[in-house]
């Protein structure tokens, strides 16, 4: 009910860089955002600081890190009985985050325009059409290094998550991760980014054009008796 960010807070879902997708409920969170913003965060793995998190509703309050311990002690000592009392205590310590750290301040409009499409191919084309916008150029460069398969399943995931409960989205993630371990780029992504750290993953397929709809849809198939039970 209360998510407090500080100037040290960083939010990112960078899983497409290792052949995965926004997991641990991340797809659900991104699916509730405006479509262009959610897709941008899922595909690019952009890093957001406190100002943007509060603006998007991913955080409910901002408290400077030097006040966090005081806030914690006040919450413990006052033993608030309901959310309203919790909010009142947090508001005592809250302040405004630094807008200068915002990525969305100058780029929200173009992000929504470029990333609101329902296919990765259309998003790539939209990036090209937006050039020479420097911000979009950086996002496009990031996209070209991600797993093509991960890009496609991540976009399908967050579009579907928009109309799902958290429970159903987690079941979907469970299906996806089983397939990532069996037929995806996950092991190669971990090797390239975390083990050998050569940052040169050999994605298979290596282009978005080679990742057809049948391959994408296979990641979302029911596991029948092996499906996650929640």
Question: Where are each of the predicted segments found?
Answer:
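Conserved catalytic cores of soluble enzyme domains
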Residues: 4-109
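Intrinsically disordered, low-complexity segments enriched in small/flexible residues
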Residues: 65-230
